[in-house]
Amino acid sequence: MHMPTPSQSRLLALPVQLLLILAGAAAMARAEELAEQPPITRPGCPDKCGNMSIPFPFGLMPGCFREGFQVTCDHSVDPPRAFLADTDTNRITVTDSDASAASDAAAYPGYTNTSYFPVELVDMSADRSQARAYGPITSGCSTNSTQYRFQTQAMTLGNGITEGPFAVSQTLNVVGGVGWRVDVAVDGSTTLACRTGTKRELAARNGSCAGQGCCEAALPPGPEYGSVAPGLVVADENARWRSSPCSYAMVVEKSRYVFSTPNLYGDRLLLESFPVVLDFAIVGNASCPAKGQRPPPDYACASSNNYCVNATVGLSGYALSYVCKCSEHYEGNPYIANGCRDIDECKFPDLYYSLVEKEASVQPH
């Protein structure tokens, strides 16, 4: 049996040594990368629900969230899903009803069933003081040419007595409708938000929400929406009920619903969910301290290099509240200690090219 010489043994060992060196270098690089990442929550608090980041003021455990920001993580599904925990205050109300005449789905007195569901989160951003959640979609589906089955969905943020920290963003969301002939309104209003047309089928175009098969409009002006319920009015008779039984009304983040003509046929949108943007603020008769004034003990802006902005949020839109922001040239989470970190513009020249160029031009030669 041929035995390798000492020199051959050393050569055979080189690939193994090289792999160990490369693995060690990769581990060190990963450790440095993690060390550079700023914290997003309080020390000792979990910051993930599956792959979803949970930044403070949101949190999963006692001591890890501000009042009103508790999140529950459902590990019974894969991947895990995150929900706002306070279902008495934040919830989706789903009401099923049947009707023989076209009307606003939210106005039907003969409800067959009402169910309540928690608000499911899509993501959260502490630096923008925003979150995204799956929003309400109201549908009306024909069971024959004159009979409809409606499902009305309403999102409620706050219990109507005390102001919650969340509101549906008026500027970052729109109200939309899908169907051959449907009028769309919000919160039972008699003011029409948008209307889809009744022209020939070829007039509908993928990606267009200009009225043929799909319409879209800004949310009506007013205070921040602490609750929102899209409503629809459909035709008295649906001659297309076999091929196009369903019409829809929704409140959705701008550009998140892209119209596709197959949505006019069948009931495929009943299985879809679309995000809405929620603004959040620190509430409880709270406002930013005046210049030179000592902040209150429960002041939420915990990081250095941050500033406070007064806000209005909640069911009435007039509750005293405020949000925290990282100062210019800083980023991160202003709601935790050392959460706002200096931006290294040189690492991101595509984002900060003009600033880097300006700073370079004033350097001494």
Model-derived features: positions:
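Typically disulfide-stabilized, N-glycosylated extracellular/lumenal ectodomains of secreted
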Residues: 2-365
